[in-house]
Amino acid sequence: MKNSFLFFVLLVVLLSCNTTTENKEAKGEELPIQGTWKLLTGTLIEKGDTTVTDYTKEKEFIKIINDTHFAFLSHDLSKGKNADSLFSAGGGNYSLHDSSYTEHLAYCNDRQWEGNDFHFIVRVQNDTLIQQGIEKIDSLSVDRMNVEKYVRVKDHL
């Protein structure tokens, strides 16, 4: 009787572990977006006009994502010594449900962007992250599609 009870408890524990794994598989694993990402290209589509920016020349942009927050930093590669000097930074918390990624921009050097939520669809394929969604801020007359293509920054250790 004692052996039957122990066998039953062991069976329940094993099945519980298996069920948890199956539930994770059924729900789908979270996309592996955590890490540091370097922006390769940014495409803005606004009022029928498309602007593609190459972030591998003359400027650089990175996004850092941990388990609850994101931050971005961008600057020109001429160290601010020409007419195209640039620095921008921002960040906040985010949520991720399947491929639906929402950023809440709490901090930004362009303060009028603060406090806004931006909804994106994200895809990760190997070391590439593609983020696509609408940026809309009525008070600034911003209403555009933004498509960003990132590559994961490898550790240099």
Identify the role of each PLM range.
Residues 4-14:
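Sec-dependent N-terminal signal peptides
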Residues 17-89, 102-157:
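Lipid interaction determinants
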